[in-house]
């Protein structure tokens, strides 16, 4: 962490007396915005998180610092951290390496209790498409597309774009939805093949919206 970073003074801004020395830290996937878990940090845990760029908590049961993934390898790589307006809660945005929950699930919350947002699902689809990049071409349609390279994938994006336009021109809404899904899928594959992600596109849209 750069000493000149605004995060360097974060520890001093927290109202530690108000939180009895342990500040709640809500952990969120920086790409999908899915809430992954909640833990507690004392000043030492927060400082270690900032210094190592891996999320560390204070374990209330073990009464010691605990770096997430220290035994499983499923660490939480720090991407951003923010203090709320009351100076008593942290929002920690991370890149999770593997499942976050000790049960092996992505999040520590019950899947039925946490409604899955479209962006979370889209991110999970991107992860699946990324995994298929090095898979046997005979194992799936996606893997076979990667094997045929940029030209073929780009051709499919163009073909599906035409199908979307034709469906819209015909006024067939159901077909428009289906063809749009095909277009989105092939576009995501193309982005992955080029080392990009939907977040790159969203960030460009945000930039243009300013």
UniProtKB/Swiss-Prot annotation:
One of its GO terms (biological process) is L-histidine biosynthetic process. Its EC number is 3.5.4.19, 3.6.1.31. Residues 122-210 are annotated as: Phosphoribosyl-ATP pyrophosphohydrolase. This is Histidine biosynthesis bifunctional protein HisIE. Pfam families: PRA-CH, PRA-PH. Keywords: Amino-acid biosynthesis, ATP-binding, Cytoplasm, Histidine biosynthesis, Hydrolase, Multifunctional enzyme, Nucleotide-binding. It is found in: Cytoplasm. NCBIfam families: histidine_hisI, PRK00051.1, PRK02759.1. The lineage of its organism: Bacteria, Pseudomonadati, Pseudomonadota, Gammaproteobacteria, Vibrionales. It is an enzyme of class 3 (hydrolase). It comes from Vibrio cholerae serotype O1 (strain ATCC 39315 / El Tor Inaba N16961). The gene is hisI. It comes from the Bacteria. GO terms for molecular function: ATP binding; phosphoribosyl-AMP cyclohydrolase activity; phosphoribosyl-ATP diphosphatase activity. It catalyses: 1-(5-phospho-beta-D-ribosyl)-ATP + H2O = 1-(5-phospho-beta-D-ribosyl)-5'-AMP + diphosphate + H(+); 1-(5-phospho-beta-D-ribosyl)-5'-AMP + H2O = 1-(5-phospho-beta-D-ribosyl)-5-[(5-phospho-beta-D-ribosylamino)methylideneamino]imidazole-4-carboxamide. Pathway: Amino-acid biosynthesis; L-histidine biosynthesis; L-histidine from 5-phospho-alpha-D-ribose 1-diphosphate: step 2/9; Amino-acid biosynthesis; L-histidine biosynthesis; L-histidine from 5-phospho-alpha-D-ribose 1-diphosphate: step 3/9. InterPro entries: His_synth_HisIE, HisE, PRib-ATP_PPHydrolase-like, PRib_AMP_CycHydrolase_dom, PRib_AMP_CycHydrolase_sf. HAMAP family: HisE (MF_01020), HisIE (MF_01019). One of its GO terms (cellular component) is cytoplasm. Residues 1-121 are annotated as: Phosphoribosyl-AMP cyclohydrolase. In the N-terminal section; belongs to the PRA-CH family.
């Amino acid at each position: 962490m750069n000493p000149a970073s605004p995060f360097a003074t974060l520890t001093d801004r927290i109202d530690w007396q108000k939180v009895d020395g342990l500040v709640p830290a809500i952990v969120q996937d920086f790409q999908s915005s899915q809430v992954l878990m909640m833990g507690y940090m004392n000043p030492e845990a927060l400082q270690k998180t900032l210094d190592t760029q891996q999320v560390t908590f204070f374990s209330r049961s073990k009464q010691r610092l605990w770096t997430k993934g220290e035994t499983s390898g499923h660490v939480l790589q720090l991407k951003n951290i923010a203090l709320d307006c009351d100076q008593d809660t942290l929002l920690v945005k991370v890149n999770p390496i593997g499942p976050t929950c000790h049960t092996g699930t992505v999040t520590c919350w019950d899947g039925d209790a946490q409604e899955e947002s479209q962006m979370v699902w889209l991110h999970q689809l991107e992860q699946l498409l990324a995994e298929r990049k090095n898979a046997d071409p005979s194992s799936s349609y996606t893997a076979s597309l990667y094997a045929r390279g940029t030209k073929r994938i780009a051709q499919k994006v163009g073909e599906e774009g035409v199908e979307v336009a034709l469906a819209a021109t015909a006024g067939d809404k159901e077909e428009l939805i289906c063809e749009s899904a095909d277009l989105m899928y092939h576009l995501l594959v193309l982005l992955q093949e080029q080392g990009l992600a939907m977040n790159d596109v969203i960030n460009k849209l945000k930039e243009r919206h300013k």
